[in-house]
Swiss-Prot record:
GO terms for cellular component: cytosol. Pfam families: CTP_transf_3. Keywords: Cytoplasm, Lipopolysaccharide biosynthesis, Nucleotidyltransferase, Transferase. Its main location: cytoplasm. It comes from Shewanella sp. (strain W3-18-1). It is found in: Cytoplasm. The keyword Nucleotidyltransferase applies. Belongs to the KdsB family. GO terms for biological process: lipopolysaccharide biosynthetic process. GO terms for molecular function: 3-deoxy-manno-octulosonate cytidylyltransferase activity. It catalyses: 8-amino-3,8-dideoxy-alpha-D-manno-octulosonate + CTP = CMP-8-amino-3,8-dideoxy-alpha-D-manno-oct-2-ulosonate + diphosphate. Activates KDO8N (a required 8-carbon sugar) for incorporation into bacterial lipopolysaccharide in the Shewanella genus. This is 8-amino-3,8-dideoxy-manno-octulosonate cytidylyltransferase. It is an enzyme of class 2 (transferase).
Length: 245
């Protein structure tokens, strides 16, 4: 089984234009993501999937590989689907999708997802990660996506709101969704062909498309929290984390 890690990256973020090229400790964010992801064991290859020549030039400048995709991709997974076709991946190849705004991605988190597919082949087509929230302020932050799952670690729902809601207590674990996915190449093509889901459109969370159409998403719990850069002020948080080791 080939394991291909793809990093979708676009320049035109509405909240943070040019985000993948934003410097963090003197190095563009996309380079942090690429270099940390490449430390994961078990990868066959790694590419940045982008529609922007500036991102392409930056990635190739530090020795990374790029696949150029259309600017019309509706979501990161749709961009991944286009990259799969351009790269000629086989149906049973495993695709890891790491967002281009995760400069602190833990390589062992990527390995967790690879191990899930190796231990339970054929039992599911898509998997992702969660992390038990420690900073309680994150629970009510709509930029921090929350998740609930069943006793067999299959996703029930993802939301920008607090889930579950404790009617009589606030003393219970809440899990953050870490924006990293693993799926078979074949399933990515299936996913991309599905119509936009109602819940997906409301929450602006593409993973809900899979749940709305009856597909299972396997969950693994990570020991590390991957800080996403959603706003310019998140850059300073990343630099603080890097300085702390």
């Amino acid at each position: 089984m080939n394991v291909i890690l793809l990093i979708p990256a676009r320049y035109g973020s509405s909240r943070f234009p040019g985000k993948p090229l934003a410097p963090i400790n003197g190095k563009p964010m996309i380079q942090h993501v690429y270099e940390r992801a490449s430390l994961a064991k078990g990868l066959t290859n790694i590419y940045v999937a982008t529609d922007d020549e500036r991102i392409k030039a930056t990635v190739e400048g530090f020795g990374g590989k790029v696949v150029m995709t259309s600017p019309d991709a509706a979501s990161g997974t749709d961009r991944i689907n286009e990259a799969i076709k351009l790269l000629g991946l086989k149906d049973d190849d495993l695709v890891i999708n790491v967002q281009g705004d995760q400069p602190l991605i833990d390589p062992t988190a990527i390995e967790q997802l690879i191990n899930l597919f190796e231990r339970q082949p054929g039992e599911f087509e898509m998997a992702t990660l969660g992390y038990e929230i420690v900073n309680k302020a994150d629970i009510d932050d709509p930029m921090q996506v929350k998740m609930v799952f069943d006793n067999n670690y299959y996703a029930l729902y993802f939301s920008r709101s607090r889930i579950p809601f404790g009617r009589d207590t606030q003393d219970y674990p809440v899990f953050k969704h870490l924006g990293i996915y693993a799926y078979t190449s074949k399933f990515v093509q299936t996913f991309a062909a599905l119509p936009l889901g109602r819940l997906e459109d409301l929450e602006k969370l593409e993973q809900l498309r899979a749940l709305e159409h009856g597909h299972k998403i396997k969950i693994a719990i990570s020991a590390s929290n991957s800080l996403e850069v959603d706003r310019p002020e998140d850059i300073h948080k990343c630099e603080q984390r890097l300085a702390a080791g």
